[in-house]
C-alpha cells in the first residue's frame, strides 16, 4: 500500500520532507511517553511528618493514583530543615514524572523572602503540577473574649498601637504574616507574641494569655472543641463546610475580601515533559472529584484544590506578592 501523507508534505523537497517527518516524530514522542506513564513506581517526597494532615491527605491521593495507574505511588517522608531536606531530594531527580515533591504555599511563596540563601529557586528547579488541598484560617479568640465580632477586634486595635496582641507559632509563620496582613488591611498595629510550638499557642489563647491568633480547624480545633476557645471569623471568601455558623472576616465587620489559607501542591523536577505534567494533572483532578476523597478531606477540614499550570502560576504570583510585601515590611529574616 502506498503511504498517504498530508498534501503539504507532498510539496516538500526530499531533505525538507525528511526534516518535517523527523520533527513530527519528535513532537509525538512526549505524548506517547505520557500515554505509557508511569512505567515504574512513582515516589512523592513530602516535608511533612508521618500522620500530619497534609501527609495523610497526600497518602490518600497517592493510594488512589496507585490504583488508577497500576503502579505503586510511594510517599517518602523527609521532614525537617524548613522543608529543605525534601526539596533537595527531588531537585536533581530525573525529570520523567516518577519523582514528585509536595510543598505548601508558605514554602513556595514565603521562604524566598524569609531566607537570604535558599538551596533552590522554585521556578528554575521545579515544574508546578497542581495543588491537592486547601484550608482556611480562623480568627481564634478565648471563649470568654470580649470580642464578639471582627468589628470589635479592629475597633480595639484602632484605639492605639499595641492595645491588642496576637500569637503565632513562630516568627515568619503563616499566622504571623497573616496577622501582619490584617494589620495593613485595617490600619492597625498589634503586639506579636511568638510561641515555639503550635500546641503552646492555642493553649495560650485558651488561657487568655493573648487576645487572638490565626489557626486552622485542625491545629486550633482541640481547644475549640474543649470550649476553651471559639472562632470569631474565617478568613475565606465564603463560610466553610463544617462551620456554617462562623462568619467570614468580611461578614463579621473586618476588611472586605480578606483571605488567608494554607494549600499544598505537587511539583516535578524542571524539564519534566509537558505531556506528563498534564497527565498527572488530569489524573489528580479525577481523584479529587471522587466523593470518598471529598468526604475524607472534609473530616480533616480540607477541601480538594485543583489548578492547571496557568492557574497554579497565577496563584503563586498572587501569594508571592502578598507574602513578599508583608515580609519586607516586617523586615524579618530566618537566616
Residue positions per predicted region:
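N-terminal secretory signal peptides that target proteins for export/translocation
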Residues: 1-13
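An extracytoplasmic/periplasmic, membrane-proximal ligand-sensing/linker region
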Residues: 39-41, 188, 225, 274-335
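C-terminal lobe and pocket-closing loops
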Residues: 220-289, 321
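N-terminal (or domain-start) structured segment
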Residues: 34-124, 163, 187-216, 223, ...
